[in-house]
């Protein structure tokens, strides 16, 4: 970079830090004066990353359990429909780009005991479902992680009804202090930062391990009525408990991925249905010296993740002084383009420092759009051409903004971001 361009780059960065973006078009402007600083800026097949064979952990499920699928789940909570989702703090999507959205019920949109993270969806017996992952927080952290199954079909008799389902795994902790742990299954303590759906299975990002797998046809009903909500596992008399959750979704296996592709902060299947893509979350401040990357792992029609033709992309983002895409919370891949849900930008736009960033392989920068405060993962619903996301924070989490509503799930018209 010559002296004149260096001065221009410094001035532009200072301007971004001191000025609030006030229009969508301004936020989409690309400063391409800075050169690419990595040699890998397009989809590149790499070596060194190893997907170990699928580790089947499902033997603990051969104990006389009765399995259910999503259509058989009793949904006991109701989301808020209409335009109420636009009332959350920092919701800055232009009206012409909005498709639809929902808000959680009062308990779920304000709790600090659980944090929503990943999102995906599927159709079963003509009914559209969204599925959201959460991790347990604060005094509930020992409960691990859960998913939420939401009916979003307007013609369905359970429209906007939803149910929380606890995630479990077979490794029994050696000692616990917060609850009574029985045999057979235990909570799954992961961040659950992203989730992808493929052929009735869920693939959930596991930060340092790789990818955990769950079969949606193997939901198990629990014994409820435990007023303490502090029992988990199969008791000596055969009763099943999960902190008073009515259902669990047990892990059936996992993929241990080695070679430095971690942290596995988010995950999503590409539009072509041939690859699972994961992104690394690194903040632009505390982790400024680390280069965030995204990886593509081929998936067979059987649902097996393959240890071949693994791809690497290092997306650019000129909002950060090092031109790297920090703060990646979610991603979606279509063709040679990747859409990134990013937080922690050094500039603010209508109450939010999040951006939806579109990166095309080989380009020196992303195209950026306004994106709501606290935005997390991405999911593409191809039948309707919707790009879904969700926001994480409960009211006044992180910022004392006076808002009583922060959390929502929303969809935008994907064509407006292509």
Predicted segments with their positions:
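Beta-strand-rich domains and repeat architectures in extracellular enzymes and scaffolds
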Residues: 61-142
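Short loop/turn segments immediately following beta-strands, especially the blade-tip
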Residues: 150-157, 214-238, 291-309, 414-418
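Structural signature of eukaryotic scaffold interfaces centered on beta-propeller domains
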Residues: 109-126, 187-198, 259-275, 324, ...
């Amino acid at each position: 970079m010559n002296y004149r361009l260096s001065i221009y780059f410094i001035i532009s960065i200072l301007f971004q830090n001191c000025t609030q973006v006030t229009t969508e078009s301004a936020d989409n402007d690309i400063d391409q004066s800075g050169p690419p600083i990595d040699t890998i800026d397009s989809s590149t097949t790499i070596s060194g990353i190893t997907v170990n064979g699928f580790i089947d952990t499902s033997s603990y499920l051969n104990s006389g359990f009765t399995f259910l699928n999503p259509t058989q789940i009793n949904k006991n909570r109701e989301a808020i429909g209409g335009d109420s989702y636009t009332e959350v703090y920092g919701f800055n999507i232009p009206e012409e780009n909005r498709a639809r959205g929902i808000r959680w019920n009062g308990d779920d949109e304000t709790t600090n005991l659980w944090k929503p993270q990943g999102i995906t969806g599927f159709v079963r017996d003509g009914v559209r479902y969204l599925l959201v992952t959460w991790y347990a927080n604060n005094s509930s952290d020992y409960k691990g992680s859960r998913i939420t199954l939401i009916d979003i079909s307007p013609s369905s008799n359970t429209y906007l009804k939803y149910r929380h389902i606890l995630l479990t795994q077979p490794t029994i902790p050696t000692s616990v202090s917060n609850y009574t742990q029985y045999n057979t299954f235990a909570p799954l303590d992961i961040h659950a930062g992203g989730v992808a759906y493929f052929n009735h299975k869920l693939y959930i990002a596991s930060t340092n391990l790789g990818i955990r797998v769950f079969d949606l046809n193997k939901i198990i009903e629990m014994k409820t009525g435990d007023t303490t909500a502090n029992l988990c596992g199969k008791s000596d008399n055969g009763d099943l408990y999960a902190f008073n959750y009515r259902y669990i979704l047990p892990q059936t296996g996992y993929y241990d991925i080695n070679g430095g592709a971690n942290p596995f902060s988010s995950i999503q299947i590409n539009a072509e249905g041939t690859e699972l893509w994961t992104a690394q979350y690194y903040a632009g401040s505390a982790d400024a010296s680390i280069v965030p990357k995204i990886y593509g792992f081929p998936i067979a029609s059987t649902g097996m993740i393959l240890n071949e033709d693994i791809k690497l992309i290092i997306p650019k983002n000129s909002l950060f002084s090092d031109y790297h895409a920090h703060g990646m919370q979610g991603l979606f891949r279509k063709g040679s383009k990747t859409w990134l849900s990013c937080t922690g930008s050094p500039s603010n736009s209508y109450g939010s420092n999040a951006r939806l960033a579109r990166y095309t392989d080989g380009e020196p920068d992303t195209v950026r759009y306004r994106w709501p405060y606290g935005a997390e993962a991405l999911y593409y619903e191809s039948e309707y051409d919707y790009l879904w996301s969700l926001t994480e924070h409960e009211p006044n989490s992180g910022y004392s903004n006076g808002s009583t509503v922060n959390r929502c799930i929303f969809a935008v018209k994907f064509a407006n971001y292509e």
